[in-house]
């Protein structure tokens, strides 16, 4: 059989088509103990500028504040591998997404050592989305989750209080980057009245206002390029309104006041001895 291979990646993907010799395997098995105990994040940088791992280190060191530091390895094609010796660092960094560099998105994945690096797709990223315009009677975390589950994977919060901003609720969602950001949702209430619920995203990096994708900016969009500059900016379907205002966790703005006679009933009847003394 004649087999042509243009790259090492082709060979890795098509080895099943080869007739392997005795020296080529199978025969070598690797166990968990053979691997290095480390925890990694693979990242893809969507900036068009050339990457410098020194600048990356200078940018993220004060933001991540890793106690034991971390290692950065360039993988080419604007991809980088961050390696830590503490799993808690990886968990904390991924929980704090989204991250940006040069104002452009940095898509991150927890890297498992069993996965070949070229198989990483960087198809999703996590964002905090604020939900605006929900009628007051429907302002619950359960309702917000129901709305968001239609358009994304909801990352359920450990503490529901993290979702409460008083007049607005928010959730952490995982979005498919091959799709445009969702601007909102037309919700039908039980009386058949329709209301528009707006989505606003926290710490949103640069995005394309023509198509709503996070992977490029306006000047690199196919819609703009194909128009040969004939489109007007007021024809853009997306805009700064997607950016959320600063989120402030709700303080204790609501308290439950017991009925007027509740405390009196708990206290019981007046002491008769006091009446006698009077």
Language model regions located:
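Well-ordered beta-strand positions in beta-sheet-rich domains
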Residues: 105, 128, 170-172, 184-186, ...
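Short, structured patches in soluble enzyme cores that scaffold and shape functional sites
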Residues: 131-133, 175-177, 201-203, 212
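BRCT (BRCA1 C-terminal) domain core and associated BRCT-interaction motifs
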Residues: 158-182
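Nucleic acid-contacting regions in RNA/DNA-associated proteins
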Residues: 1-128, 133-140, 157-160, 185
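The conserved glycine-aromatic submotif of the RRM
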Residues: 75-83, 163-172, 205
């Amino acid at each position: 059989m004649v087999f042509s291979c243009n790259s090492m990646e082709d060979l890795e993907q098509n080895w099943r088509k080869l007739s392997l010799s005795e020296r080529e395997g199978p025969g070598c098995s690797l166990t968990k103990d053979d691997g290095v105990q480390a925890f990694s994040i693979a990242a893809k940088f969507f900036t068009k500028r050339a990457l410098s791992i020194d600048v990356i280190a200078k940018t993220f060191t004060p933001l991540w504040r890793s106690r034991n530091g971390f290692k950065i390895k360039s993988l080419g094609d604007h991809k980088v591998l961050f390696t830590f010796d503490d799993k808690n660092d990886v968990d904390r960094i991924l929980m704090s997404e989204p991250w940006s560099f040069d104002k452009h998105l940095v898509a991150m994945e927890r890297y498992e050592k069993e996965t070949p690096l070229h198989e990483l797709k960087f198809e999703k990223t996590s964002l905090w989305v604020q939900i605006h315009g929900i009628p007051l009677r429907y302002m619950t975390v359960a309702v917000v989750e129901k709305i968001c589950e239609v358009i994304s994977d909801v990352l359920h919060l450990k503490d529901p209080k993290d979702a409460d901003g008083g007049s607005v609720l928010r959730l952490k969602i995982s979005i498919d980057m091959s799709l445009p950001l969702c601007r909102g949702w037309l919700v039908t209430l039980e009386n058949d009245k329709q209301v528009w619920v707006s989505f606003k995203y926290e710490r949103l990096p640069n995005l394309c206002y023509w198509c709503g994708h996070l992977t490029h900016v306006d000047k690199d969009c196919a819609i703009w390029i194909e128009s040969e500059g004939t489109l007007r900016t007021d024809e853009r379907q997306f805009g700064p309104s997607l950016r959320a205002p600063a989120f402030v966790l709700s303080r204790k703005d609501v308290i439950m006041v017991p009925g007027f006679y509740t405390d009196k009933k708990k206290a019981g009847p007046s002491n008769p001895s006091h009446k006698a003394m009077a």
